[in-house]
């Protein structure tokens, strides 16, 4: 089984949780992007990977070439001769995509436990045994994601 999908728009990195005296919460921008990832993934994949199935995930974050660059440098960027070394960090892009593919959970105060609000692509990101995250330049900003069963090769 293999899943491919594209999240249109500029890649976003996972932000640190915010902490007040009594509450810890995820910033709104991070939560919205995780929801966008979840909806895009669910719409492109109607099933769900098995609980114990090892997964291989490849994430390629494409950034627009800066408009301030010369034509020569733009062509180098598009030919992958010059790579993006700007924010967000590759690990934070990977984290937000991985968390977005998890099921959305919410604490039920009456039951005192977490309940699933919306399904994900897999049961938990602990199933991912191989992860590759790349940052590249392209004409339009987007994130391409490929998930498949990890064969251990």
Per-range role (PLM):
Residues 1-153:
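Acidic, proline/glycine-enriched N-terminal capping motif
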């Amino acid at each position: 089984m293999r899943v491919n999908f594209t999240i249109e728009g500029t890649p976003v990195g996972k932000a640190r949780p915010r902490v007040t005296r009594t509450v810890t919460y995820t910033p709104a921008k991070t939560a919205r992007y995780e929801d966008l990832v979840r909806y895009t993934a669910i719409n492109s994949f109607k099933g769900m990977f098995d609980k114990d199935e090892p997964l291989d995930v490849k994430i390629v974050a494409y950034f627009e070439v800066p408009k301030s660059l010369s034509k020569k440098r733009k062509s180098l960027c598009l030919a992958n001769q010059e790579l993006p070394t700007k924010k967000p960090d590759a690990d934070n892009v990977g984290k937000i995509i991985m968390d977005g593919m998890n099921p959305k959970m919410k604490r039920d105060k009456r039951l005192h436990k977490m309940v699933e609000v919306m399904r994900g692509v897999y049961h938990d990101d602990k199933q991912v045994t191989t992860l590759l995250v790349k940052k590249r330049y392209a004409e339009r900003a987007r994130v391409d994601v490929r998930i498949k069963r990890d064969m251990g090769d």
